[in-house]
Amino acid sequence: MFSTRLSHRRGGNLRQAPGETKFGRGALLAFERLGFAVDLAKRMSSDELQNILDKTWSGLAKAVDQVNHPWRFPALGTQGLDGPNVRTMVLRSADAAARQLTAQTDIRSAKVSVFRKDPRVAWYFFDPQTKVQVRAHGSVTVHHDNEVTRAAWAAMPEANKHNYAMPPAPGSPIDDPSLGQAPAGDEAAAYANFAVLSSGITFIDWLQLGDEWHRRAQFTWTGGDWRRAWVAP
């Protein structure tokens, strides 16, 4: 804190003591209050960023269980064999503690080879009501016939399992659209085509559009925690 001690000159005039500040007590109190206000603002800003991160993950978790949630069907972008590509997926799980999002697919799908060649992906979510956009970057691990797929398969409704029993692989040419309908086939054969895509998230870009101004924040995984920062929209 600034010192406010003053020394007397001869004749009654005041002079500044060596090493002392020229500011008066009122100015010093103002500086002190300003510093407190800045510290408080920083703490509030940090708390708000953490709240945004927490709400983002809780919103993703809700989307898993709520069919009508706007984040239920995200777009998933990849760097494909022939360039960038994007497709709509169904969000199957969201785990904040593990920083993990999952989806499911047919192991015969062309995108599986894309993930295996370059596992980097970008998830895109948008809520038109709150005008919140979330982009999440990470890497995909393809699970096939292991503990992860067995647990997911056991929890899957029977009707959904039929989707993996189609004889033609996804993307194969067919003569009639009806040939692409999944029959009620052998469950073991259907399971053999089932895969889980697990994506570890390392970066989140959050943007909220407003009528007068927008807000944007970024969260980067550092290996032990999320680095949080406001950025220009």
What are these regions (language model features)?
Residues 4, 17, 21, 27-30, ...:
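Ala/Thr-enriched low-complexity intrinsically disordered regions
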Residues 10, 17-21, 176, 180:
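A generic alpha-helix propensity feature with a strong bias for hydrophobic helices
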Residues 21-22, 51:
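Coil-to-alpha-helix initiation sites in intrinsically disordered, low-complexity, charged segments
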Residues 30-233:
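Binding-site signature for planar aromatic cofactors or substrates
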